[in-house]
Swiss-Prot record:
The protein's Enzyme Commission number: 1.21.98.-, 1.11.1.6
Reaction it catalyzes: 2 H2O2 = O2 + 2 H2O; 2 2-iminio-3-(indol-3-yl)propanoate + H2O2 = indole-3-pyruvate imine dimer + 2 H2O
Listed GO biological process terms: antibiotic biosynthetic process
Pathway it works in: Pigment biosynthesis; violacein biosynthesis
Name recorded for this polypeptide: 2-imino-3-(indol-3-yl)propanoate dimerase
Originating species: Chromobacterium violaceum (strain ATCC 12472 / DSM 30191 / JCM 1249 / CCUG 213 / NBRC 12614 / NCIMB 9131 / NCTC 9757 / MK)
Gene3D superfamilies: 1.20.1260.10
Pfam families assigned to the protein according to its UniProt record, in alphabetical order: Ferritin-like
Length: 998
C-alpha cells in the first residue's frame, strides 16, 4: 500500500519556495472575482505607474523588523508579506537518500543507493527548449495556506556525487500537478513572537505518482550496486503495481533574512510502490484524524501480522532555534517531537493492537515518521491511536480526488454557454476502495460551482460547472477534506474585441496591469509589463506562455493561473496585431532582362550553354559518388548497408529500369546533356559556331548566372539533393531569387521580338539528336530531333528544355516527369528513412589539379595522374563535337562518326575514370578524390574536314602516350584500346577510308 509497503526509499533535504505574498491581501485591495485592484477604496487608476501602488502597500502597517517583531520602521510589511517579489519557483535542494527499507523493515544505511540525489524539475518548455526547468508552487487561493499546488514535470534520481552531466539512475515525467494534503498549523509547539510564527508552524504533505507504463518512466540500463534498487525494479514487475509514489512533507519554514527573499522548508520523503486502486496524490491507508489542535493526520496499514504507520506530519516538534546551527543548514534546528507518551493503537472493542513507544516517534530524523510494529491481534471496526495527552480517531469514510486546485471558467451568460469539467473521485471505507453513491459535500467561498454526480463502479465522476467567479472549496464530509478551486473572472465580453482593437494599451488595461500591480517580480527580474517595447518584442512568447493549453505546465504564465480564456486569447490577438503592423513594401517585379539585339541573344545563349553544362556535371558527380550495384552488394555483406538501402541507392539487381537514386540522377544528367545540345542548336541557328561551354562553380557561377543556389561538384547527400531541387525550382511556384526558367524567359522573349534572327536560307541548322527525350515528347512529337531552323522551332526547343526541367505548370502532364518533381520524390524517399542514409563515397568537393578558390586540390599521385588524363579526354570529346559542327552538317548527329566518337569517349572513358577517381584516395585524410572540375578546353576546329580529323588523331596519340606512362593496372586495357581505336578511326576519316556518317 504505497509508502506503507516495501521496499521504501527514504530521503531528506530542503525545499526552496519562492511564492509571492502580496496577493494574500490582508487589507482587501484585491477583488479575486474580477482580478482588479483598489487603492484607498477606489479602483486603481491604470494610467498611474504600478510603483505607486507598490509604495502604497509598503506604507501600510503593521510593520516588522528583521527579528519579526513589531517595528514601525521595520522593513517587513504585512500588506506585502515577506516575499512580494516571489516568482512561484519551487525546487528541492540537497535532497538525498538517507536510508532504505525492504521486506524486514529494518533501515539499511549502507546500501549503494544511500546518498543518491533526488530532484524535482519543471516541464520542458517546447517553445524555449530549456533545461534546468523549475517547478512551480501556486496558491490557487492566496488567502489560504491549504491551497498550494505543485506544477512539476520531471522526477529524477542520480548517483551520489552526480554532476550535471552524470547519467541519472531513474527519470520519470510527471503529467499531473499535485496539491497540498494534510495542511496543519501548530507543527512547532513553541512560538517565538515572530510575525511569521504561523508560517513557521505549518506542515504540509505532498504526493505524486508516476506510472510505469509511461514512455519516459526509465531506469538507467547500466549496472548499479544496490540491493534496494534491484528489489524496487523487481517489485515493479507485479501487475498490481502501477508505478512509483513519491510522498514528501514540508515544515519548519526558514526565517526570511530580508523582504523579497525565497524561503526554505525542511523536507522528508519516501519513494514507494503505487498500487492499483490508490489515488496518485493522496496518501493511501486507513486515515486517523487528531482530536487536539497542533496534531496532524496519519495513515496506517494493517497486514501480514504487522502495522505500518505514516506519522510524517502527525506529531509537532517542541521547539525551534532562532537560526540554523551550521552554515550548510538552510533552516533553524528543531527540538524533539512533543513527548506524548507511548501511543496505543486499539480497535473499536478497545483491544490493543500495537504500541508506538515514545522513543520511536521521537527518533524522527532516523525514521522520518514511518514506523513498523508487530500486530498483537487482528483489528475489528474503527481504530484509535491515543495516549493520555493525544488521540486520533479513524475516519471511516474518506473521499478524495487527484484533481485539486481546479480553475473553472465563469459562464458566458450573454450566449448561454457553460464550461463544465469532469473530475474522478475515489471513496475508501477504512482504507479499502468502496462505491459511495452519496458523497456529502457543500460549497464554501466567494465562488460558486454546480456539481453533478455519476457513479462509475468504485469511482464517482463529478461534473463541475463554474457559476460565480471567485475562490471556492467543495467541502467533503465533515469538512476535514476539501477540493479547492477557483472560478475565473467573467471576461467573456473581451471576446468581442477585434485584432485591430487589441493594441498594447488595450492588453495592458484589461490583462497585464493586474499582474504588474500584484506580482512585481516580472518588472524586477524579467521585464516590466508596463514597458510597451518589451511586450511588443516578446508578443509571440507571451502568447505561447499564456496559451490555455499550457495551463498545467510549470512554465505557464501567469504562474498563478487565474487568467481566464478570453483574456488569454487577447494575447493571441495582440500578437496578430503586432504582426499586422509589418506591411510589405513590395519591390518592383524583377522580370526577365530584355535582350536588345541578335548579338546579345547569342551571348545569352552561350551563357545558357555554360549553365546547362555546369548543371549536368553536378548531377553526374553526385551520381558517380554513389557506389554501383556490385559495390552496394558488398556494403550489404559488410553490414554497412541494409538490403533496403541498397534498393534505394542502386535499385534492383536485375539492372532493368529500377536503378535507384544513382540511375535516376544519371537519367536527369543525360537529359541535361540534351538541353546543352538544344541550346547549341539555338545558337547555331543564328549563324554562330558550336560553343563547347565552360563549367562554372561557386562564386564564378553566381556572378555569371545570377542564381542564389550554389553550384558545386559534391557527393550525393540530403543537402546536395536540396540544392538540386532548388536549381530546378519552377517559375510558376513563387520563390525568392532568380530561377533557371527566368534565364530562358528572356531568351524566349528575344526570339519572339527580334527580327531577322534567321538567315534567308530555308532548312534546318545545327544537329539532330533523338536520345534521352521523354515519352511524352515521343507521343506528341514522334519526329522531333531537337532541330532548330525558324522562330517556331526555336520556341518549341525552349519549351522542351523548360518543361523537362520544371514541368511547365502544376496541371501539366510534364510536371510529374519533370526534373523538379522527380528530385522532390527522391528527396521524400530519402527523408522517409527511419535513420539518415548517406550512400555516397566521401569524395572531395570541387576537386582540382591546381589550387583554385572554392576548390580542393588533390594531392595523391595516382589520383592526379588519372585526373590529368580525364581532363585530356574531356577536351578531346568537345574537340570532336566542335569539328563535327565546323563543317555545318545537315545530317543527324547520331549518324556522325565524330559525334558517336565523342559519346563513346564520354561513356567508355570519362565515366569509368570518374568512378575510379571516386574510389581513390585524394591525399586528404578521410576523403576520396573525384573527377576534376574541368578547365577551359581547346576546341580548335578546321574548315578542312581531313585536317581536322588528323589533328584529332594526334590528340588521341598524345593521350595514349600519357596513359602509357601510368603504372600498370591504373588504367584498364579496354580504355587504352578505345583511345587507340579512335586514333586509327580519325586517320581513316582523314584519308577517306571511312564515310563521315555511319
Amino acid at each position: 500500500m504505497s509508502i506503507l509497503d516495501f521496499p521504501r526509499i527514504h530521503f531528506r533535504g530542503w525545499a526552496r519556495v519562492n511564492a509571492p505574498t502580496a496577493n494574500r491581501d490582508p487589507h482587501g485591495h484585491i477583488d479575486m472575482a474580477s482580478n482588479t485592484v483598489a487603492m484607498a477604496g477606489e479602483p486603481f487608476d491604470l494610467a498611474r505607474h504600478p510603483t505607486e501602488f507598490h509604495r502604497h502597500l509598503r506604507s501600510l502597517g503593521p510593520r516588522f523588523g528583521l527579528d519579526g517583531r513589531a517595528d514601525p520602521e521595520g522593513p517587513f510589511s504585512l500588506a506585502e508579506g515577506y516575499n512580494a517579489a516571489g516568482n512561484n519557483h519551487f525546487s528541492w535542494e540537497s535532497a538525498t537518500v538517507s536510508h532504505v527499507q525492504w521486506d524486514g523493515g529494518e533501515a539499511d544505511r549502507g546500501d549503494g543507493l544511500v546518498g543518491a540525489r533526488l530532484a524535482l524539475w519543471g516541464h520542458y518548455n517546447d517553445y524555449l527548449r530549456t533545461t534546468f526547468n523549475r517547478a512551480r508552487w501556486v496558491d490557487s487561493d492566496p488567502t489560504r495556506r491549504d491551497a498550494a499546488q505543485i506544477y512539476a514535470g520531471q522526477f529524477t534520481i542520480s548517483p551520489a556525487g552526480a554532476g550535471p552531466g552524470t547519467p541519472w539512475l531513474f527519470t520519470a515525467d510527471i503529467d499531473d500537478s499535485h496539491g497540498a494534503r494534510w495542511t496543519r498549523g501548530g507543527h512547532i509547539a513553541e512560538r517565538g513572537g515572530h510575525f511569521l510564527d504561523e508560517e513557521f508552524g505549518l506542515a504540509r504533505l505532498f504526493q505524486f505518482s508516476v506510472p510505469k507504463d509511461h514512455p519516459h518512466f526509465l531506469f538507467h540500463p547500466g549496472p548499479f550496486d544496490s540491493e534496494a534498487w534491484r528489489r524496487l525494479q523487481l517489485a515493479l514487475e507485479d501487475d498490481d503495481v502501477l508505478g512509483l509514489t513519491v510522498q514528501y512533507a514540508l515544515f519548519n519554514m526558514s526565517t526570511p533574512p530580508q523582504p523579497n527573499s525565497p524561503v526554505f522548508h525542511d523536507m522528508v520523503g519516501v519513494v514507494g510502490l503505487w498500487r492499483r486502486g490508490e489515488l496518485a496524490s493522496y496518501p493511501a491507508g486507513r486515515l486517523l484524524r487528531p482530536r487536539q489542535p497542533g496534531l496532524g493526520d496519519l495513515t496506517l496499514r494493517v497486514s501480514g501480522g504487522r502495522v505500518a504507520l505514516n506519522l510524517a506530519c502527525a506529531i509537532p516538534f517542541s521547539t525551534r532555534a532562532a537560526q540554523p546551527s551550521a552554515p550548510d543548514r538552510l533552516t533553524p534546528d528543531l527540538g524533539a517531537k512533543l513527548p506524548l507518551g507511548d501511543l496505543l493503537l486499539r480497535d473499536e472493542d478497545g483491544a490493543l493492537l500495537a504500541r508506538v513507544p515514545q522513543a520511536l516517534y521521537q527518533d524522527y530524523w532516523t525514521n522520518h515518521g514511518i514506523v513498523d510494529l508487530p500486530l498483537l491481534r487482528e483489528p475489528r471496526g474503527s481504530l484509535t491511536l491515543s495516549s493520555e495527552l493525544a488521540e486520533w480517531r479513524e475516519q471511516d469514510w474518506v473521499t478524495q480526488s487527484d484533481a485539486s486546485n481546479l480553475y473553472l471558467e465563469a459562464p458566458d451568460r450573454r450566449h448561454g454557454r457553460f464550461f463544465p469539467e469532469s473530475i474522478a473521485l475515489r471513496s475508501y471505507f477504512r482504507g479499502e476502495a468502496r462505491a459511495r453513491p452519496d458523497i456529502p459535500h457543500r460549497i464554501e467561498g466567494m465562488g460558486l460551482v454546480g456539481v453533478e454526480s455519476r457513479q462509475d463502479g468504485d469511482a464517482a465522476e463529478w461534473r463541475l460547472t463554474g457559476l460565480r467567479p471567485g475562490p471556492a472549496r467543495i467541502v467533503l464530509d465533515d469538512g476535514a477534506e476539501a477540493i479547492p478551486l477557483r472560478v475565473l473572472p467573467d471576461d467573456w465580453a473581451l471576446d468581442d474585441a477585434t485584432v485591430e482593437e487589441v493594441d498594447y494599451a488595450f492588453l495592458y488595461r484589461h490583462v497585464m496591469a493586474y499582474y504588474e500591480l500584484v506580482y512585481p517580480f516580472m518588472s524586477d527580474k524579467v521585464f516590466s509589463l508596463a514597458d510597451r517595447c518589451k511586450c511588443e518584442t516578446y508578443a509571440r512568447l507571451m502568447w505561447q506562455m499564456c496559451d490555455p493549453q499550457n495551463r498545467n505546465k510549470s512554465y505557464y504564465m501567469p504562474s498563478t493561473r487565474e487568467l481566464s480564456a478570453p483574456k488569454a486569447r487577447l494575447f493571441l490577438k495582440y500578437l496578430a496585431h503586432v504582426e499586422g503592423q509589418a506591411r510589405l513594401q513590395a519591390p518592383p517585379p524583377a522580370g526577365p532582362a530584355r535582350i536588345e539585339s541578335k548579338a546579345q541573344l547569342a551571348a545569352e545563349l552561350r551563357k545558357a550553354v555554360d549553365l546547362e553544362l555546369s548543371v549536368m556535371l553536378q548531377y553526374l558527380y553526385a551520381a558517380y559518388s554513389i557506389p554501383n550495384y556490385a559495390q552496394g552488394q558488398q556494403r550489404v555483406r559488410d553490414g554497412a548497408w541494409t538490403a533496403e538501402q541498397l534498393q534505394l541507392a542502386c535499385g534492383s539487381g536485375d539492372r532493368r529500369r529500377d536503378g535507384g537514386i544513382r540511375a535516376a540522377l544519371l537519367e536527369i544528367a543525360h537529359e541535361e546533356m540534351i538541353h546543352y545540345l538544344v541550346v547549341n542548336n539555338l545558337l547555331m541557328a543564328l549563324g554562330e559556331p558550336f560553343y563547347a561551354g565552360v563549367p562554372l562553380m561557386g562564386e564564378a557561377a553566381r556572378q555569371a548566372f545570377g542564381l542564389d543556389t550554389e553550384f558545386a561538384l559534391e557527393p550525393f547527400s540530403e543537402s546536395t539533393l536540396a540544392r538540386f531541387v532548388r536549381l530546378e525550382w519552377p517559375h510558376f511556384i513563387p520563390a525568392p531569387g532568380k530561377s533557371i526558367a527566368d534565364c530562358y524567359a528572356a531568351i524566349r522573349q528575344a526570339f519572339l521580338d527580334l527580327p531577322d534572327l534567321f538567315g534567308g536560307e530555308a532548312g534546318k541548322r545545327g544537329g539532330e539528336h533523338h536520345l534521352f527525350l521523354n515519352e511524352l515528347t515521343n507521343r506528341a512529337h514522334p519526329g522531333y530531333q531537337l532541330e532548330v531552323f525558324d522562330r517556331d522551332s526555336a520556341l518549341f526547343g525552349i519549351a522542351f528544355v523548360t518543361d523537362q526541367g520544371e514541368g511547365g505548370a502544376l496541371d501539366s502532364p510534364h510536371y510529374e516527369h519533370s526534373h523538379f518533381q522527380r528530385l522532390r520524390e527522391m528527396s521524400a524517399r530519402i527523408m522517409a528513412q527511419s535513420a539518415p542514409f548517406e550512400p555516397a563515397l566521401p569524395a572531395l568537393r570541387n576537386p582540382v589539379l591546381d589550387e583554385s578558390p572554392g576548390c580542393q586540390r588533390v594531392a595523391d599521385g595516382r589520383a592526379r595522374a588519372l585526373m590529368a588524363l580525364y581532363q585530356g579526354v574531356y577536351e578531346l570529346m568537345f574537340a570532336m563535337m566542335a569539328q563535327h559542327f565546323a563543317v555545318k552538317p545537315l545530317g543527324s548527329l547520331r549518324r556522325s562518326r565524330l559525334m558517336n566518337a565523342a559519346i563513346d569517349l564520354m561513356t567508355g572513358l570519362l565515366r569509368p575514370l570518374s568512378c575510379a577517381l571516386m574510389n581513390l584516395p585524394s591525399g586528404i585524410a578521410g576523403r576520396t578524390a573525384g573527377p576534376p572540375l574541368p578547365g577551359p578546353v581547346d576546341t580548335r576546329s578546321y574548315d578542312d574536314y581531313a585536317l581536322g580529323c588528323r589533328m584529332l588523331a594526334r590528340r588521341c596519340e598524345r593521350l595514349l602516350e600519357q596513359a602509357s606512362m601510368l603504372e600498370p593496372g591504373w588504367l584498364p586495357d579496354a580504355q587504352m584500346e578505345l583511345l587507340d581505336f579512335y586514333r586509327r578511326q580519325m586517320l581513316d576519316l582523314a584519308c577517306g577510308k571511312l564515310s563521315r556518317e555511319a
